[in-house]
Amino acid sequence: MRCLPVFVILLLLIASAPSVDARPKTKDDMPLASFHDNAKRILQILQDRNACCIVRQCC
């Protein structure tokens, strides 16, 4: 029972500690938005190629 207050205090201290990024940011890190933009661009290119081949104008 004597350990319970210490345990509660430790939990409160851990919960209120500022969050820190586990690894430092490097020059190779890219924002997630750029990955989404790249994926959208690639999908658009593939859709354009598929539509073109269905019409058989550029195959």
Swiss-Prot record:
Organs and tissues of expression: Expressed by the venom duct.
Keyword hit for Secreted: yes
Pro-sequence residue ranges: 23-48
Signal peptide from the UniProt entry: 1-22
Main location: secreted
Pfam families for this protein: Chi-conotoxin
GO cellular component: extracellular region
Entry superkingdom: Eukaryota
Entry keyword set: Disulfide bond, Neurotoxin, Secreted, Signal, Toxin
GO MF annotation terms: toxin activity
InterPro entries hit by this protein: T-conotoxin (IPR031565)
Family statement: Belongs to the conotoxin T superfamily.
Identification of the protein by name: Conotoxin mr5a
PTM: Contains 2 disulfide bonds that can be either 'C1-C3, C2-C4' or 'C1-C4, C2-C3', since these disulfide connectivities have been observed for conotoxins with cysteine framework V (for examples, see AC P0DQQ7 and AC P81755).
Compartments in which it is found: Secreted
Domain notes: The cysteine framework is V (CC-CC).
